[in-house]
Amino acid sequence: MLFFTLLIQLFLVPVLCQYACSSELKFGTACSENKTSTKWYYDSKLLFCYPYKYLGCGEGSNSFESNENCLESCKPADQFSCGGNTGPDGVCFAHGDQGCKKGTVCVMGGMVGFCCDKKIQDEWNKENSPKCLKGQVVQFKQWFGMTPLIGRSCSHNFCPEKSTCVQGKWTAYCCQ
C-alpha cells in the first residue's frame, strides 16, 4: 500500500498538476447557485499566475482559489525567464555580468541568469510596476505584503468594481 501511495505522489500528481496548469482558461458560466468571484489561472505563455473573474459555475481545471495556490501548483520555484518570456541571448552569473553582450542585461534566477534584451526587459519591468495617470494602482495582499493587482488581459474582468483596467503590451492593471 505504501508503494502505491508513493507511486501516486511521485508520478500521477505532477502529471495532473501539469495538465491543469497548461489547460485553457475557462471563465465558467453565470448561474443562480454561485456568485462571481476572482480566481487565478496559470498562463503558460508568460509562465505566471493571473487573476480572472469566474462566473460561478463550470470552471476548468486551470482555476485556483488564490495566487498562492496557483503558484504552488504550477510554477517551479526555480523557474524564471526574460521579460514577456522572450528568449535569452546567453547566460550570466551575476547582475552587471560583463559576459552579456551590449544591448542585453543579466536577469538572475537562482544560481544562473539569462542575458535578456535590455529594451524588452525595461518595458517588462515598467509594466509590472504600474503607475496610474489618475488615482492609485489597485493592490492585493500576499504573504510578503501588498503588491499591484496585475492581470493578463482587461478582457478577464479581474479589476474590482469602480476601478478602471489599463491594458499593456503583456499584462493589465487596475486604477482606482
Swiss-Prot record:
PROSITE patterns reported for this sequence: BPTI_KUNITZ_2
Ranges of residues in domain BPTI/Kunitz inhibitor: 21-74
Keywords carried by this UniProt record: Disulfide bond, Glycoprotein, Protease inhibitor, Serine protease inhibitor, Signal
Gene3D superfamilies (UniProt xref): Pancreatic trypsin inhibitor Kunitz domain (4.10.410.10)
Source taxon at top rank: Eukaryota
InterPro entries per UniProt: BPTI/Kunitz_domain (IPR052861), Kunitz_BPTI (IPR002223), Kunitz_BPTI_sf (IPR036880)
Signal peptide start and end residues: 1-17
S-S bridge residues: C21-C74, C31-C57, C49-C70
SMART domains: KU
Residues that carry a glycan: N34
Pfam families named among the record's database cross-references: Kunitz_BPTI (PF00014)
Coiled-coil residues: none
Gene Ontology terms, MF aspect: serine-type endopeptidase inhibitor activity
Protein's name in the database: BPTI/Kunitz inhibitor domain-containing protein C02F12.5
Organism encoding this protein: Caenorhabditis elegans
